[in-house]
Amino acid sequence: MPAHVVTPPSLGRSFVPNLWDIVALVLIVGVMALVVYGGEQINVPLSALDNPAVSLDPWNLPEYALRTTLRMLTAIACSLLFTLVYATVAAKSRRAEMVLIPLLDILQSVPILGFLTFTVVFFMSLFPGRVLGAELACVFAIFTSQAWNMTFSMYQSIRNVPKDLEEASRSFHLSAWQRFWRLDVPFAMPGLIWNTMMSMSGGWFFVVASEAITVGNSTVTLPGVGSYVALAIQQRDLAAIGYALLTMLLVIIAYDQLLFRPIVAWANKFRFEQTSSGNEPTSWVLDLFRRTRALRALSVPFDAVTHSISNWQFRMPWRWPRGVAPKWLSRLLDVLWVLGIGVGAFYVGWRIYGQLSETLAFADVLNAVGLGLITLTRVVVLIALASLIWVPIGVWIGLRPKLAERVQPIAQFLAAFPANLAFPIFVVGIVQYGLNPDIWLSPLMILGTQWYILFNVIAGASAFPNDLREAASSFHLRGWRWWVKVVLPGIFPYYITGAITASGGSWNASIVAEVASWGQTQLQATGLGAYIAGATVSGDFPRVVLGITVMCVTVTLFNRLFWRPLHAFGERRLRLG
């Protein structure tokens, strides 16, 4: 009896397009047309921008939404590439980790306006007189608001790969390249996807600051939802703010349905478990493409290419065999590496000291450190309160995939809500009731960053192995014991990632949140953020540098002394497998 040959695309079915092919093709062509149209708008001369570039006419919002979304998707793609490289090197190399992770702590705490100050001139000089230079500067600013939490998530996942899976990869003699694509990336996928969602939502807050590019004495305003919101706030036009929020909601629903929900449903196969979960996430877009014939047939060559790339045998031409390298050589390299880091840190500190000592006294440093401790207290209290609220809610959502599907766009919209739109409510309330700004301006710091905790806890609960839940049920673990013995240890690494990024984001937001204004009314809280904001407005560059330096040092020390020991505890004691 002749053997039956199974065709790869559709198990022997006809290649004739069906109705689903037509629908999918229309969807693909429509998205590509929008991308091409948006791409054409970024390669025009600066003089081609309308004056004014942004109008509060709501009929312009569809085009503004398209251009802002393309900028954010471009930044997400760059953030993903950065994450795959940076997080992997930090997780795999002990010596690189000593530099890269503290550097990441510093980068996420540096205000986004600090990046804009140094990068706008560079990107504008690459394409002088073209809109593309301003677009790249805007994309880079959005990138700095998206990349850090994705990198922390990937780093945490690689460091917590189950030991039995590591042993299996060694027994199959996988190269480092093969292990990366077959083990590290799949295991990191749940957390990375939810952090990518958070990055997209968090980017909405920063487009308000990044779509108005200042070069010298001139300002280039790029058409987009962010610049629309900034103009609406400036003119105190509540109707325009409402139109912008509605546009944001529609855009979030669109990319949730077309991008994130299909990815979540597709990535469900990477869950680390031995039994099938009862309720799996679904996506009508993914189901649509799975029902096509011609498109699936056309995708076979691409699948073959990606499969062959993931199987490449990248190996070092020569290296010390495992366990053969002399111990003295390893120790010598460690000493030289630490010495190099110390010399570099001393040089940077000396240069900063040389710049500041000419204009500032030691009392100024003590004042900045004291203000930093006040802001640190705010951050710690707010992170603790946000954890008490969002950890139980995140676990409840993450363990129910169907509920997570419904909550997903709502959570993305809440995370995308620009915190500066809440300033009028807080300012009016504080003035009306005579409240203390030092206390009641503090929630503005966590308004946009609390979602890092929620999204990471949802990711951890979503990736929680179903067989462990069944084992807990068979042992009749309920109530407090279920939380302490089962769920909290399972989501702990994800929570730490969310808390670290929320903490760093809160430091960044303190510059905006500790000084809130609406119209002619301005309120100020005591803290390092208000110190930096005041120095920036007055043009006091030495105090700006001092404030940012104190902020970076405080964040790094706090992460080293508090968050990193907790992260190491999770790796050592709460690792699956």
Task: For every predicted segment, state its role.
Residues 81-86, 93, 100, 137-140, ...:
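Membrane-embedded alpha-helices of multi-pass transport/permease systems
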Residues 1-77, 245-384, 558-577:
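N-terminal, non-cleaved signal-anchor transmembrane helix
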Residues 105-145, 412-449:
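Generic hydrophobic transmembrane alpha-helix motif, especially the helices
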Residues 153-192, 456-497, 532:
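Short cytoplasmic-facing helical segments at TM-TM junctions of multi-pass membrane proteins
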